[in-house]
Amino acid sequence: MGCGPSQQKEDQSQSRIPSPRKGWEEGSKADVRVTSSKENCSPQTEAAWPKHTIDNAKSLDQQAQIGSLPGTIPENSPTPSKTSRRINSDPVANGLTNKPQLPESWERPKSSDILEELIVQGIIQSRSKVFRNGESYDVMVDTTEKPLRKPPARLKKLKVKKEVKDFTIQDIEEKMQAAEERRKTKKEEIRKRLRSDRLLPTANPSDEAEPPGRVEVPFTKGLPAVNTPALEKSDVQEGEPLKRKKSESDVAQMNRNYSCTGLELVESDMYYNQEDNIF
């Protein structure tokens, strides 16, 4: 109960607020409107309209009929993300707070589980858990699928050169000995050359055994040898007759003089020119 003006205000507010209606009532009203519009249309007007407009009208009628049924979902329904945004944007509805809906909780796989799966599949080889000091691992390669090819000729040549370049201690010692022998031979050759150039040749022992009739002068190379008169006599007798005959006493005296001169020359040569005095 109350005063008159207060009752009037309440009646006006109630008349303004529309009462909630159910979906099937709205759908039935829409069907009635569509059917009435179809009845009002004449066949002449339908012929005047183009075909695509008629098809669009039919599709709209079908959508309206489907949407009028209770519990139906329209084709152009919003995506779940949009609906979740709408729900989140309206945190308070009917006096209750709506919490944001999280996706279904799912556990992340552990690394140990992933490793076990890979080991079972054979992608990763299993490792021994016990480790020891000085433990070695052999890596084996299966060569049954593809046979190993021979290296090209160029690589073979390089390998041969490398093998030849590797020297041993024996090879080095042999080379050192050969070098020493060469050095000795060179020294001997140099000494021989010096002797032949600087030294005078020594008297041969065969000269002493020769008869005293002929004596050669050793230090005069280009001059002819001195002949005794006895030999000259024999040579002249073969070629031409002698013009004068010498006495035997003269011949003996001449032989003595020549023999003395030859001995003096040999002694001086042997005394002054010796090998020890050279070096």
Curated annotation (Swiss-Prot):
GO biological process, one term: regulation of microtubule polymerization or depolymerization
Extent of Polar residues compositional bias: 34-45
Entry keyword set: Lipoprotein, Myristate
This protein's record includes keyword Lipoprotein: yes
Domain of life: Eukaryota
Lipid group attachment sites (N-myristoyl glycine): G2
Disordered as annotated region, ranges: 1-110, 178-254
Coiled-coil segments: none
Biased composition, class Basic and acidic residues, residue ranges: 22-32, 178-191, 232-242
Domain SLD, chain residue ranges per copy: 121-248
Cited PANTHER family: STATHMIN, STATHMIN DOMAIN-CONTAINING PROTEIN 1
The protein's name in its UniProt record: Stathmin domain-containing protein 1
